[in-house]
């Protein structure tokens, strides 16, 4: 049993109101295949539709234009290689949304950077120090990504507002709405 499953089961056993909602397997799909499945929906509507159906998905190849001429989501051309990245999303019934938990990818190399700068219409960035170093192979190849720690806490604890798991200064109107709904912000 992996750590996530142990953690998940521990929370479900300790807090009766928390029910198991993650599927056993994650669905892997490219952004183009997702567009092909739901061509009449917006990218965000597609994400919702697939996570509602599958529970958890890894959407791959985000950033470049799809067959429709529209990218699935915006991604900087000098960050991830658009053919080697993706997002993990889960269906979150508390808010009835597709909740992104992580975004990751293999960073651009000299070839993907040149191609993506061209596709994005910003080849002038090739002269910037970081981009130039990549194009001249002066930097190592890397991977990266992030985990939305507060979003994961929201998900496991079934909270309705990020302010229930993350301390911040919230505008008065947000505090008032939260209070009206019985949500205690940190």
For each predicted feature, which ranges?
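Extended, charged alpha-beta segments that form solvent-exposed binding/catalytic grooves
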Residues: 1-45
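A translation/RNA-centric and nucleic-acid-associated enzymatic feature enriched
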Residues: 28-186
């Amino acid at each position: 049993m992996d750590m996530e499953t142990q953690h998940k089961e521990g929370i479900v056993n300790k807090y009766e109101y928390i029910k198991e909602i993650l599927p056993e397997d994650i669905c892997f799909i490219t952004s183009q295949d997702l567009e092909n499945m739901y061509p009449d929906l917006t990218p965000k509507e597609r994400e919702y539709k697939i996570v509602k159906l599958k529970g958890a998905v890894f959407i791959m190849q985000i950033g470049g234009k799809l067959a429709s001429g529209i990218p699935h989501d915006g991604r900087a051309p000098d960050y991830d290689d658009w053919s080697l990245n993706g997002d993990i999303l889960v269906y979150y019934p508390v808010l009835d949304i597709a909740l992104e938990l992580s975004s990751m990818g293999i960073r651009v190399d000299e070839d993907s950077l040149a191609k993506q700068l061209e596709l994005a219409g910003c080849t002038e960035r090739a002269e910037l120090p970081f981009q130039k170093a990549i194009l001249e192979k002066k930097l190592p190849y890397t991977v990266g990504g992030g985990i939305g720690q507060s979003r994961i806490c929201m998900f496991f604890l079934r909270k309705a507002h990020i302010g229930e798991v993350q301390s911040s200064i919230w505008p008065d109107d947000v505090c008032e709405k939260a209070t009206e709904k019985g949500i205690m912000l940190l």
